[in-house]
């Protein structure tokens, strides 16, 4: 099993969620996050004063899937989240040792 963490632009969340549901992903965790990468931040002017905004708002989607579903999920996220502009985000793929469904005690892929 693998955990896929995708950091994407917030306005792409609904499109990515719908695409993941369409390919059979039954659950995900979504967190509002802030960060910066190569694009760094940007400058804004508020009431005549210039401010540097270092951390940009992003959304983190976390999904745990079977090994055989990883590429399909990654391709779906890339296809739907990509704008072609700086700041589109990143995807991380992390090994998952076990999953336990708290309600039933099920373990492994049955608990996904």
Swiss-Prot record:
Classification via InterPro entries: N-reg_PII, N-reg_PII-like_a/b, N-reg_PII/ATP_PRibTrfase_C, N-reg_PII_CS
One GO cellular component term noted in the UniProt record for this chain: cytosol
GO biological process, one term: regulation of nitrogen utilization
GO molecular function terms listed in the Swiss-Prot or TrEMBL record: ATP binding; enzyme regulator activity
O-UMP-tyrosine found at: 51
PROSITE patterns for this protein: PII_GLNB_CTER, PII_GLNB_DOM
Protein function: In nitrogen-limiting conditions, when the ratio of Gln to 2-ketoglutarate decreases, P-II is uridylylated to P-II-UMP. P-II-UMP allows the deadenylation of glutamine synthetase (GS), thus activating the enzyme. Conversely, in nitrogen excess P-II is deuridylated and promotes the adenylation of GS. P-II indirectly controls the transcription of the GS gene (glnA). P-II prevents NR-II-catalyzed conversion of NR-I to NR-I-phosphate, the transcriptional activator of glnA. When P-II is uridylylated to P-II-UMP, these events are reversed.
Protein name in the entry: Nitrogen regulatory protein P-II
Source organism of the structure: Aquifex aeolicus (strain VF5)
